[in-house]
A protein has these predicted regions:
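Structured core elements
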Residues: 28, 60, 85-86, 108-110
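Conserved AAA+ ATPase "SRH/arginine-finger" region at the nucleotide-binding site
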Residues: 30-33, 107-120
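Conserved catalytic/switch belt of AAA+ P-loop NTPases
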Residues: 61, 65-94, 100-104
């Protein structure tokens, strides 16, 4: 049996929605591969785009729990100032894995695991919607 949460699918859906709105930039990072310097570079570009063209940046950070609580501090001033909108995805309990200051500035959405039946229903609806 496999359990699916579809975090990556959610990121793709958000990315597609951002592409439809030309004033929003979407960046996806994985905390398993990225570091604080990668976030700093994204923030630098986000500040420039915000100042020059009022283009907003959404940062999707997959596996955000892989950043330790000190590393997570990098997000705070930029989330507070509105330079970035942070979407953090994790399979861990955010109450334990996220910095309290960051967590207090977030809304937590719990994505429940989908059963095989749920996935089958979703795929059937997608096939119908796409006329496949």
């Amino acid at each position: 049996h496999y359990a699916f949460v579809f975090k990556t699918s959610l990121a793709h859906i958000i990315h597609r929605m951002c592409q439809e709105k030309h004033n929003v930039r979407f960046v996806k990072l994985s905390a398993t591969l990225a570091g604080v310097n990668d976030v700093k570079e994204i923030v630098k570009i986000a500040k420039n785009e915000m100042n020059l063209s009022k283009r907003h940046t959404i940062l999707f950070m997959d596996e955000i729990h892989r950043f330790n609580k000190l590393q997570q501090d990098i997000f705070l001033p930029h989330v507070e100032s509105g330079v970035i909108t942070l979407i953090g995805a994790t399979t861990e309990n955010p109450s334990f894995s996220l910095n309290a200051a960051l967590l207090s500035r977030c809304r937590v959405f719990v994505l429940e695991k989908l059963s095989a039946s749920d996935i089958s229903t979703l795929l059937s609806k997608a096939i119908t919607a796409l006329n496949i």
